[in-house]
Amino acid sequence: MDERIISSETVDAEEVSFETSLRPQTLSQYIGQDKVKNNLTVFIEAATLRNEALDHVLLYGPPGLGKTTLAMVIASEMGSQIKTTSGPAIERPGDLATILTSLEPGDVLFIDEIHRLSRAIEEILYPAMEDYCLDIVIGTGPTARSVRLDLPPFTLIGATTRAGLLSAPLRDRFGVIDHLEFYTEEQLTEIVLRTSNILDTKIDDLGAREIARRSRGTPRIANRLLKRVRDFAQVRGNGTVTEKLAKEALTLLQVDPRGLDTIDQKLLHTIIQSFRGGPVGLDTIAASIGEERETIEDMQEPYLLQIGFLQRTPRGRIATETAYNHLGISYEKEV
């Protein structure tokens, strides 16, 4: 496949628009992440009672789990406007200064991929986050002088798939740090049913569960698979997504019962057949299957680790007995 249907990254502008149309507006509508939601409910209510901006929030976890959606829900619950940007989009200190000085009291600033901010940009954020002020330098050379501008109280929400790449000074300035976890099959089934209702697509409970089962614990993938299975239901079925039709469609889309596609299987086969199950270094795996190291770390490893198909050790990656069994390969434990 040219495009991984089970990729947890957004593919194009059309998919971004599709996701936006599905987003809940309140925490009560947001499915899953119950611990995170319960804590945020308390923090938001407390900030509202004190008439203060919510403390800065860092959301981290694999792609597609709802970090952007949750940021927008937080802003909605606070009755605030949200301005969105991303780490790579803020190239110069002036870019960030322009955004910060445009904020109104109580606004939410959402920075996706916040781990990709440069250190120079981070240093501007420190006083903005701590003291709601902005230090800028006017002029150059001997006549240069520093001017401090006051900023209105605001909430910064940062999202990242790689929290370990954030500098300690930046990470320490977030008052709320939440990790988003993979979703359960039951939660994803509920999401699929909700999305099908919004799309006016007929689906039965078993059909929804079959899609959920193969969605890698990720709502973005569940919604994408539903769209594709819906196509099969309309063209090759009677318009209703049943368990039988979902299985047939997902098999044709090369998504197996555990949500693995050909690239996942190639990775596991490489570890097992070329390196006797491991341990083998990530760079070696990447070179062997023709993928970038970062792609494997962000897109494939988290789920394979979650379902117990892969182990990460100081010496490298190891395919587990569960992975052998799933691929139908005989497992011989070394003595």
Curated annotation (Swiss-Prot):
Residues 184-254 are annotated as: Small ATPAse domain (RuvB-S). The keyword Ligase does not apply. Pfam families: AAA_lid_4, RuvB_C, RuvB_N. Residues 1-183 are annotated as: Large ATPase domain (RuvB-L). Mg(2+) binds at T68. ATP binds at L22, R23, G64, K67, T68, T69, E130, D131, Y132, R173, Y183, R220. It is found in: Cytoplasm. One of its GO terms (biological process) is DNA repair. Residues 257-335 are annotated as: Head domain (RuvB-H). Keywords: ATP-binding, Cytoplasm, DNA damage, DNA recombination, DNA repair, DNA-binding, Hydrolase, Nucleotide-binding. Its main location: cytoplasm. CDD domains: AAA. It catalyses: ATP + H2O = ADP + phosphate + H(+). DNA binds at R293, R312, R317. The keyword DNA repair applies. One of its GO terms (cellular component) is Holliday junction resolvase complex. SUPFAM superfamilies: P-loop containing nucleoside triphosphate hydrolases (SSF52540), Winged helix' DNA-binding domain (SSF46785). GO terms for molecular function: ATP binding; ATP hydrolysis activity; four-way junction DNA binding; four-way junction helicase activity. Its EC number is 3.6.4.-. The RuvA-RuvB-RuvC complex processes Holliday junction (HJ) DNA during genetic recombination and DNA repair, while the RuvA-RuvB complex plays an important role in the rescue of blocked DNA replication forks via replication fork reversal (RFR). RuvA specifically binds to HJ cruciform DNA, conferring on it an open structure. The RuvB hexamer acts as an ATP-dependent pump, pulling dsDNA into and through the RuvAB complex. RuvB forms 2 homohexamers on either side of HJ DNA bound by 1 or 2 RuvA tetramers; 4 subunits per hexamer contact DNA at a time. Homohexamer. Forms an RuvA(8)-RuvB(12)-Holliday junction (HJ) complex. HJ DNA is sandwiched between 2 RuvA tetramers; dsDNA enters through RuvA and exits via RuvB. An RuvB hexamer assembles on each DNA strand where it exits the tetramer. Each RuvB hexamer is contacted by two RuvA subunits (via domain III) on 2 adjacent RuvB subunits; this complex drives branch migration. In the full resolvosome a probable DNA-RuvA(4)-RuvB(12)-RuvC(2) complex forms which resolves the HJ. Belongs to the RuvB family. Has 3 domains, the large (RuvB-L) and small ATPase (RuvB-S) domains and the C-terminal head (RuvB-H) domain. The head domain binds DNA, while the ATPase domains jointly bind ATP, ADP or are empty depending on the state of the subunit in the translocation cycle. During a single DNA translocation step the structure of each domain remains the same, but their relative positions change. HAMAP family: DNA_HJ_migration_RuvB. This is Holliday junction branch migration complex subunit RuvB.
